[in-house]
Amino acid sequence: MLMNDYNGWKNQATWSVNVLHMETIVEMLNKGNSEEYIKFQIKDSCKPEDMNLYGRDMFYSAWATIDWYTIFNRAKENMEQTV
């Protein structure tokens, strides 16, 4: 798969977090929340514990591939651009 398949993001899971949660991540960073807390809140909002066994397994497999370093760096860049 080519990088441009996900608009330059590492994989589909990372791209999905960018599309679905970036605004929330920026807001939470602005409020002083830690990166670990933000990841917990995003995971909690997806409610993997309510998924069936197969859905939960797929969720955690995708979760493990998210490039959080790039996500948080992009969020910080977005914060700097809005100042």
Model-derived features: positions:
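Acidic interaction surfaces
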Residues: 1-83
